[in-house]
From Swiss-Prot:
Catalyzes a salvage reaction resulting in the formation of AMP, that is energically less costly than de novo synthesis. It comes from Mus pahari (Gairdner's shrew-mouse). Belongs to the purine/pyrimidine phosphoribosyltransferase family. This is Adenine phosphoribosyltransferase. It catalyses: AMP + diphosphate = 5-phospho-alpha-D-ribose 1-diphosphate + adenine.
Amino acid sequence: MSESELKLVARRIRSFPDFPIPGVLFRDISPLLKDPDSFRASIRLLASHLKSTHSGKIDYIAGLDSRGFLFGPSLAQELGVGCVLIRKQGKLPGPTISASYALEYGKAELEIQKDALEPGQRVVIVDDLLATGGTMFAACDLLHQLRAEVVECVSLVELTSLKGRERLGPIPFFSLLQYD
């Protein structure tokens, strides 16, 4: 991994204390998206990791609603594979399957179209940030329901103190940047 590219990416993540609620330190990726060099570097770094780890044995990238959509298609294009969408409930047409996950005050659901993947296809799930792991875990559940193989989950940022990586169990996880 190129240290200079990683530094370029890290410089474009800013922090906002007490947002959206007191006690939370929000990691904002907006400056990264605004800067084409930093965004390209983030895609190159993620793609480089996946190429070296899976040597071309990835069929699809699955982008998580909504900020995973910002990275999923570009990452898929860099790898020469397709991209499928995992959406919040009620956003996809046609037959879907769903998986629930816990929120701070209730629960939510993710969906994927039933015909999005074939059994045995190898998929990498991407999102902008891993916190508690609830959304990523629900996405893994969806892909397992379709009998696809989740080969890895990746994100730009990982909040290590929230232990989301542990929630994923044996599924490999990679992040470019780690914060407490």
